[in-house]
C-alpha cells in the first residue's frame, strides 16, 4: 500500500526495556567450518513494535513500519550488493522472509494462527533503480513490485507479544526467479516447491525477532543512531 512505498519511522529498540533507537543493525559473518555466525559485538536480535492500523485522509497509514536494508560485503570489506543486481543478476535473485519457531513472549499467549506467516508480518519489496540510489533523494524509482530482490524493503509486524526466527533466504534461480506455473513472483514468505527445484540458496540464515509492544503503548525513541 502507499504508506509502505513511502516508508516510515525506524523505531527499533536496543533492548527489551521501553527505550528505542531509530536504527538497529545486526551483522553476520561467514566463517570457515562454521557457516554464518553472529559477528562479535553485534546485537543478537531485533526488538520491534506491533503495527497499528490507521487512516489519514481516507488512506491506510499503518505505523510503525520498518525500513529494512540488507548489505553484503566481501572479505575485503567492500560492498557487493551490485553482484545481485547488475548484468541480469536481478532477474534470478530474490530474498524471502519467513517467520518460524513462533512462540509467545513471557506475557503473551499462543494463538491458533501463529504459524500463518501472513498473520505475523507484512513485507513489501521497495528495491530501487538504480539499486544504490534513493527515491527520497529523487535519484531513483521504486521498482521492487515489478522486480522483487529484497535488498531494500518495508516490513511491519502484525502481532505483539510474539517471538520468532525470521528466516532470510536469498534465492538464486538457475534461469529465472519467476514461478513457471503462475508466471508471477512467489510471495515474500513462501517460495514454491517448483521454484526451489529450479534454483539454490545463496544465503540462508535466521534472525531472532521479539515483538514486545503494540502501537498504543508508550516507548521512548532515542535520537542518537550511533
Where are these regions (language model features)?
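Bacterial Sec-dependent N-terminal signal peptides
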Residues: 1-10, 226
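N-terminal edge beta-strand
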Residues: 18-61
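Short beta-strand elements
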Residues: 22, 181-226
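Residue-level recognition of well-ordered beta-strand positions that form the cores
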Residues: 29, 71, 169-171, 210
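Exposed beta-sheet edge/beta-hairpin loop segments within beta-rich domains
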Residues: 56-66, 84, 131-184, 188, ...
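Beta-strand-rich structural segments
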Residues: 68-75
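Extended, polar beta-sheet/loop recognition surfaces of beta-rich domains
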Residues: 78-136
Amino acid at each position: 500500500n502507499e504508506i509502505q512505498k513511502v516508508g516510515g519511522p525506524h523505531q527499533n529498540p536496543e533492548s527489551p526495556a521501553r527505550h528505542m533507537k531509530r536504527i538497529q543493525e545486526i551483522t553476520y559473518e561467514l566463517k570457515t567450518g562454521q557457516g554464518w555466525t553472529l559477528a562479535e559485538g553485534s546485537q543478537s536480535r531485533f526488538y520491534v513494535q506491533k503495527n497499528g492500523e490507521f487512516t489519514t485522509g481516507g488512506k491506510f497509514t499503518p505505523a510503525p513500519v520498518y525500513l529494512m536494508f540488507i548489505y553484503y560485503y566481501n572479505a575485503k570489506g567492500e560492498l557487493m550488493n551490485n553482484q545481485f543486481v547488475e548484468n541480469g543478476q536481478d532477474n534470478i535473485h530474490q530474498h524471502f522472509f519467513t517467520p518460524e519457531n513462533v512462540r509467545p513472549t513471557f506475557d503473551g499467549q499462543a494463538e491458533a494462527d501463529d504459524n500463518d506467516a501472513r498473520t505475523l508480518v507484512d513485507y513489501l519489496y521497495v528495491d530501487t533503480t538504480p539499486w544504490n540510489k534513493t527515491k527520497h533523494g529523487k535519484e531513483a524509482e521504486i521498482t521492487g513490485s515489478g522486480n522483487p530482490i529484497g535488498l531494500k524493503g518495508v516490513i511491519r509486524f502484525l502481532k505483539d507479544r510474539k517471538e520468532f526466527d525470521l528466516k532470510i533466504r536469498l534465492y538464486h534461480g538457475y534461469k529465472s526467479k519467476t514461478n513457471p506455473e503462475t508466471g508471477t513472483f512467489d510471495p515474500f514468505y513462501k517460495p514454491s516447491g517448483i521454484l526451489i527445484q529450479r534454483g539454490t540458496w545463496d544465503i540462508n540464515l535466521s534472525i531472532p525477532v521479539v515483538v514486545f509492544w503494540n502501537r498504543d503503548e508508550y516507548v521512548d525513541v532515542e535520537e542518537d543512531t550511533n
